[in-house]
UniProtKB/Swiss-Prot annotation:
InterPro entries: CEP350/CC187. The keyword Coiled coil applies. Residues 816-851 form a coiled coil. PANTHER family: CENTROSOME-ASSOCIATED PROTEIN 350, COILED-COIL DOMAIN-CONTAINING PROTEIN 187. Residues 1-41, 62-184, 219-278, 300-319, 392-484, 496-539, 551-658, 1010-1030 are annotated as: Disordered. It comes from the Eukaryota. This is Coiled-coil domain-containing protein 187. GO terms for cellular component: centrosome. The keyword Hydrolase does not apply.
Amino acid sequence: MPTLVVGTPPTCLGDTPQPCHKNSQRQGPFSHGAPGRAADWKAVAKPRLCAPAAEDDVAALRWPGPSQQPDPPWAAPHVVGSDDLKEPGPWGKACSLPMWSTGPEARDGDSSVSSGRLSCSSGGHDVCVSWKERPPQVLGPQQRPRKSDARLEQLRDKIRAQAWQQGSCASLGTSAPSSASRLHKASTLMLRRKGQEAKNPPPAPECSGFSILSAAERRVEAKASHGQGRELSRVSQHQVPVLREKPKRVKSSSCKREKTPKLPSPRRAAKDKHKDEDSELVGVYAWRKGQALVRSLLGPPPVLRRHHSKDPSRDPALTVDLGDSEKVIAAKCSPVCAQLPDATSAYSDQQVSGNTPSLASFDQPATIQTAMAILQDLRQQIQAGLELAQARKGGQELGPSKRRLQDVAGRGCCRDPNAQSSFSKSPWAMTERKHSSLERARSVHTWEPWSSSTARESCPQRAWGAQGQDRSFQRPESPHERLGHFSQRPWSALAGQACSPQRAWGAQRQGPSSQRPGSPPEKRSPFPQQPWSAVATQPCPRRAWTACETWEDPGPRLRNPLERPSPPAQRPWSSSGVQRAGPQGKGRGIGSPVSAAKHALPRPTGSFPQNPLGKEKDTLRPCPRSRGLLGPSHSSESLREFMRQKAQARRRQALEEKASALRTRELRSRRLQEVYRQQREAVLGRAVPVVSRTTPGIVTFVPSSAQSGGLEASGSLESPVLEWSKVTSGMVLGGQEAPGSFCLCLNRAWNHAETLDPPGMGGPQDGRDAPVLLSASPSLGSLELQDLTTRYLPRGMCIYLDPKEAEHLGTSSSLHLRHKQAQLQALETTAKVLKQRVDSLTAKLQGAEALDTVRDPAVGLLRSCPHSLPAAPTLATPTLATPACPGALGPNWGRGAPGEWVSMQPQPLLPPTYFLDGETLSWGPSWEQQQSVSPRAHCESKPRGFPEEGHVDVKPDKRLQRGVAPFQALSPSAGSSYAGPATLHPIWGSLGLEETPSVGGADSVAPCTPRSCGKGDPADRPWAGWSGGRGIHREHLPLPSTRAWPYGVEKSFSTWRASTPRY
């Protein structure tokens, strides 16, 4: 903002003001925060700002209070308090006193001395200060640098404050942030600012310690801490009555500026830059000069311990604070100051904040005397502690005592709440009172955060590595332990060893973030956080190293039993320095006490930090520890290998599970297949004897060949052709033929539609396994055909069994006897069939009409549905096709044993021709009776021979001659007749059975009674007379007719034709 240059004051109150150079315009309370008012100020108040250039006139602007003694030229000028001024009157009217505004910082709430942003013109321009009705004689031309009493007095007051704070040289440095230090810093900034307002200082003071670099650094730091100083300045206004400012005035002006915040114009920015540089020069010089003086007089400050985890300013990066730049400049004046800037400033911050009200009222000599006394007391205390330690342990004992004393001093300053909150009392003396004795110091030392770790000499590297040192401050060549310890020691016994090699690597330890642009790292960084050093005056590196060594060796007795062992991260320093007695050990051991003292000086983090917020963030950003503490680090290769192994294991497990599942499935499948196979074998290959031992009177008809397409009911004219498959002798057990067993096998057509396969016996040898239709007749009476059909009857097999015969034969009957009976029955049956044919032919010949009556339907039947009765195969090759179960079906075959059948030669069977209903063969008077008694007594008119020729052979003799042997072989077992009258031969009887539903079309064999086995009455064996035997009764063989089937038996007959053997 444009301001007025101090010029020649107007001679009268109403004179028009003369405009001054706008580059040198001063920012006033009307111009800083309110650009609109700046124009008014420029237009109206300019003439009031011009004053004669008299060097003595500046004295009128100095502080009315503390002292009127001239100060050294490097002292900062006083700032006029707001209470010394009166309210401004209307323009054109003079007011009693000038009023100095706080400048732009007042708007921000920072009225304390900061980086000198209030107004000292640079570049030869006169100082333009904001005022209200200022007397003209107060201001004079400021064309040349002046060293007025106001500046000296201001500087003297500031030095008094600093000396009262034991010469702290790190009030603006990296000391622990605390409310006291903040207040003190705010007050010092305010003092410095007002001093700069009072007088325009020289652009570049000639005193030592000043430099453009320091001014620039100071300005940057002031800007960085500008946000912090806003609230602090307000607090300092109330807490520093020495300044005699009216807080309301400051706040009102601040409010005025805050109400209309606008961006500063370029001219104002340039002016602010100049003023900042000038004010920074003054403030920096005052601070540095006081710092150097205090340190030169008082020596090293005591240690303020702090916890690493709670102290943001412990990190090496935090050393880059407001005090770093000044610390480097002060190092030029005092080598001790270069080494001990941070902790000293921290200590002075805490004390000055508590003592600021009374510091300004004292003269500089008194302040210096007080500071000298305090430092002397501290020096004596430290010396006594060192001597006591040396007396106890010699070279090794020196370290523990020194460490205890340092611990005592640091704790007296920081551990004590009173000392920490207010340092108006001598903290060193208080520390001396509290911890004057070595034992007491030891007891205090035991509960220090680093005492437990120091006692752990077995793990030196853990303590170093566990330090929360910032990796950003670690150079590659410097180990973590060395960097962490050296960067984090608040005050070290090596403070005086600026020439030691540790100083070099301490500078290396300082990360780029911890080094200011223009500050020499070797001077600033070696001991960045050593606020106090018990050995600050020790020029000998070896002596400092001895102190460090002894610090490193506290011994187990220093640990408090009640103390909880601090984790490695909390162990600031350990016995690593003691174990490394060599030069390298020194280098590393030196850092140990520093870290220990760093833990010993817990800088309060609750209050504002000394570092600017931005800088603190920058320095705290790289703070995260290395990942070593988080657990064992794994390389990407190891992780990939681990994942590969896991994937392979999963794949293997999946493959194993799949293979196991496959094996289980295969095993189950095999088991199921085996079960199914066994079931099939049980069903298909059941070992069921065709001829049972207990019932040897079974006759089995095994189908050899049949018309598979013509399986119809027996009542149909197209009944399937029935053929003899084989006739065997011997008993069949299971799937094999037992020697001497008897089976009569022929093709059957069952009346029922169910088809049964012959299980296991292989069926007929000709390979044609025709299905069989079962037809049963209710006229069978005692025949148990259905039982066998439902239980054991295989397909293509018909078993006729007379239960009585079975019971009679049983196991008591000899097999040979049964065979004979079967043979006899077969012979009788054959004879009967032949006799019936002969009789039929004879009757046919005798009666032409009767013959015609009988022949025509027979021929039609043969032509329409030819049937053949195959010749029985040779008995030399007996093979039963299918097994059957006993005791179910069976006509009343005789008991004749089929054993003799083997010797019989089969011949083509000449089956008789059956006639349909209505056709009757005149065989004799008993035909009708036989027919009425047993409908199975199917008779044929005459044997017709082979029906496949389509004609009936009328040569009965020839037919009889050819058919005797087969019928003998086909005679059923002896005594196989049932209770009912059954006198037909087996073949004709079987044809008759075909019509009976109970028998299931048992038209293949006619049952025979036991008396038909060569023993009974010839009447029971109508064919006996044919074979030259016993009582042939032709009247017992009726021809099939309507009258021959009184029981509703189906009247369709099958014509058997003898076929040649197929074996």
